[in-house]
Amino acid sequence: MSRSQLWAAVVLLLLLQSAQGVYIKYHGFQVQLESVKKLNELEEKEMSNPQPRRSGLLPAVCHNPALPLDLQPVCASQEAASTFKALRTIATDECELCINVACTGC
């Protein structure tokens, strides 16, 4: 294998790896990191919205049609609010995501 072929293979591998995305697994749910970032955006918009919030057991974001598809099953859970909170916490912790090589257990 020539040096240019090896370089092309490395670049292709990196592109494929980044295209797959990062997934978070929590209590039987598997969601994309990008979906949790979108969840944060939606919740920030909900907080800044002066309209009255819906009452009920479900978090308000569960009523938002822009909620990513992989997060919608969480809304069917009785622990939806605590699950969303945990996902947001995990998404902001570099060691939980194994982004930082200095973290143990990655």
Curated annotation (Swiss-Prot):
Q: Where is the signal peptide?
A: 1-21
Q: What residue ranges constitute the propeptide?
A: 22-91
- Give the tissue specificity: Localized predominantly in intestinal villi and the corticomedullary junction of the kidney.
Tell me the domain of life: Eukaryota
Query: What is the protein's name according to its record?
Result: Guanylate cyclase activator 2B
Q: Where in the cell is it found?
A: Secreted
Query: Which source organism does the UniProt entry give?
Result: Mus musculus (Mouse)
Major place of residence: secreted
Q: Which gene encodes it?
A: Guca2b
Q: Name one GO molecular function term.
A: guanylate cyclase activator activity
Q: What does this protein do, in the record's words?
A: Endogenous activator of intestinal guanylate cyclase. It stimulates this enzyme through the same receptor binding region as the heat-stable enterotoxins. May be a potent physiological regulator of intestinal fluid and electrolyte transport. May be an autocrine/paracrine regulator of intestinal salt and water transport.
Q: Please give the Pfam families that the UniProt record associates with this protein.
A: Guanylin
Q: Which UniProt keywords apply?
A: Disulfide bond, Secreted, Signal
Protein family: Belongs to the guanylin family.
Biological process according to GO? adipose tissue development; body fluid secretion; cGMP-mediated signaling; energy homeostasis; glucose homeostasis; multicellular organism growth; negative regulation of blood pressure; reduction of food intake in response to dietary excess
SUPFAM superfamilies from the UniProt entry? Proguanylin
**One term under GO cellular component:** extracellular region
The record's section on InterPro entries has: Guanylin, Guanylin_sf
Q: Which cystines does this chain contain?
A: C62-C75, C95-C103, C98-C106
Q: Which PANTHER family match?
A: GUANYLATE CYCLASE ACTIVATOR 2B (PTHR11318:SF4), GUANYLIN FAMILY MEMBER (PTHR11318)
